[in-house]
Amino acid sequence: MLTLGDYNTLRIVKSVDFGLYLDGGEEGEILLPQRYVTNDMHIGDEIEVFIYLDQEERPVATTEHPIAKVGEFAWLEVAWVNQYGAFLKWGLMKDLFCPFREQKMCMEQGHSYIVYIKVDEDSYRLMATAKIDRYLSLPTKEEEDTLRHGTQVEILVWQKTDLGFKAIINNRYQGLLYENQIFQPIHSGDRLTAYIDHVRQDGKIDLTLQPSGRQHTLDFAEVLLRYLYENDGHCNLGDKSPAELIYDRFQVSKKAYKKAIGDLYRRRLITIGDDGISLVK
């Protein structure tokens, strides 16, 4: 069965001057335009293609990769706007339509927005919606077992709030990065690796950008030790240095830096002074 707005593996059944026809099952033959045909494609081969709708709303294949597919969230820029809605750049020749009824605010050309990509049930057209809350779910009790403290996840930064930044976790859940846990510049639309800090009773998820636990401390301690060996045995950042300076140099939080210093100090590998830390001679 052909899946619109997603990748499909289809067999080549016919070659014509303007491309290749692929077996689309119940949908009939699907055109792969000549611009995407390569010399290693032959009749009978199965190839992976992305299926979307052309200007006449017919299924068409491409070997290009869109920024996101149906069922995913993405940060997309508005290419142009008309009396029906906005058209978003998503990496394919035909822009993705977001009608006015699916916009939380009037989208403007050149601005970017978080949207969810779906197939419209009434028209069977690919569509974006900025009303994304309805597509975010709360984890079930069983799913919470896979979202334990320290679990690595992929996030899409959503929007700034008074507390920090909302984020979309693994294309499914809503999370929050607290302002006092952010030690690097981040912006709406950034895709980042993050870690589960806590699943609250209301199902909302607190996030951190720093891995936690003893192993992370040991891993960074070795990085810091190597830095000292490569820099004449000294680092001018101590446990009282500003968090921003620590992050700029090592991309870790001040808390992680202090833990690593403490570990190296307990192992009698460094001394701690007013001017930073130094290797024991």
Residue spans of the language-model regions?
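Single-stranded RNA-binding regions, centering on S1/OB-family and related RNA-binding modules
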Residues: 1-281
